[in-house]
């Protein structure tokens, strides 16, 4: 069978000599995830998606094939096609412990060094230059920003200083003009990493797209809540200790954007996610000293 062929699950399992199938229940994706083990005890990840996602998943498959040529620890795509009435993508399965749980077992120096490694991996991913989007970042970003503001203002729940958030966002949205675009992981944080033999493994490229490289740092809160040293190392590793003058100003803007979009999103998932959204807001207030700081308090500088 060739890549792109339609197969049944049994045919696929037979083709790869699979002897064991286990379901994996992790992450927010609606994809079904199966861990496959073949007769030689090689492991694979089988992602099963709705057929309506064909264009997105096929593009993801092709981009992953390009990224996998880099010397980084990430899943390698093996096969892609239609599986019964759905889509499948077969990837190598990488061993490791969940980084968000494992990171706190390391010393501050070790956490920082793992962050350095993650930052260097991210820089390598961003070095892909064989393809780009036809639309500019601003052309994609501006319509989304209008929807985010309207959704937030129409939301039943808001932050106490929501007017400040909206005004700051509107006053600084010009920063999004003329931003470069590169290939991004799309959700680069500890929740999508493993640690194996004291090294970072990057997984779950489900949100891979072309975006402003600084947009990649937007989910930093999930790192900082586990390790300020890891996030500091990630930034320093990415920039080789030479932080651009505009980085923290843009990171603050993206932080405000995240606060505006997080709460309405959380409301669709229930009370616990709403509590998390408010907790993140309180932390951001603390890290930015009520938004008086440009550089958040968790950043440790070059160590």
Model-found features: residue ranges?
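Glycine-rich, phosphate-binding/catalytic loops in enzymes
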Residues: 64, 107-108, 201, 218-220
């Amino acid at each position: 069978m060739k890549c792109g062929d339609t197969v049944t699950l049994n045919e696929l399992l037979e083709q790869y000599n699979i002897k064991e199938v286990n379901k994996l229940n992790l992450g927010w994706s609606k994809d079904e995830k199966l861990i496959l083990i073949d007769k030689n005890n090689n492991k694979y990840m089988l992602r099963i998606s709705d057929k309506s996602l064909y264009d997105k998943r096929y593009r993801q498959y092709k981009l992953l094939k390009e990224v996998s040529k880099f010397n980084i620890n990430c899943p390698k795509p093996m096969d892609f096609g239609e599986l019964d009435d759905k889509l499948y993508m077969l990837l190598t399965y990488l061993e490791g412990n969940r980084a968000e749980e494992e990171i706190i077992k390391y010393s501050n120096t070790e956490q920082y060094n793992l962050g350095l490694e993650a930052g260097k991996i991210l820089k390598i991913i961003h070095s892909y230059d064989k393809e780009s989007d036809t639309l500019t970042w601003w052309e994609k970003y501006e319509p989304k920003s209008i929807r985010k503001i309207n959704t937030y203002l129409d939301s039943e729940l808001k932050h106490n200083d929501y007017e400040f958030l909206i005004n700051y966002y509107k006053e600084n949205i010009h920063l999004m003009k003329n931003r470069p675009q590169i290939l991004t992981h799309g959700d680069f944080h500890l929740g999508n990493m493993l640690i194996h033999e004291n090294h970072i493994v990057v997984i779950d490229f489900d949100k891979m797209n072309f975006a402003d490289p600084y947009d990649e740092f937007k989910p930093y809160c999930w790192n900082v809540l586990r390790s300020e040293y890891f996030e500091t190392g990630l930034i320093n590793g990415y920039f080789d200790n030479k932080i651009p003058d505009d980085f923290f100003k843009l990171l603050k803007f993206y932080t405000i954007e995240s606060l505006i979009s997080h709460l309405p999103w959380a409301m669709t998932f229930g009370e616990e996610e709403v509590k998390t959204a408010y907790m993140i807001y309180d932390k951001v207030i603390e890290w930015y000293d009520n938004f008086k700081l440009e550089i958040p308090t968790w950043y440790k500088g070059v160590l």
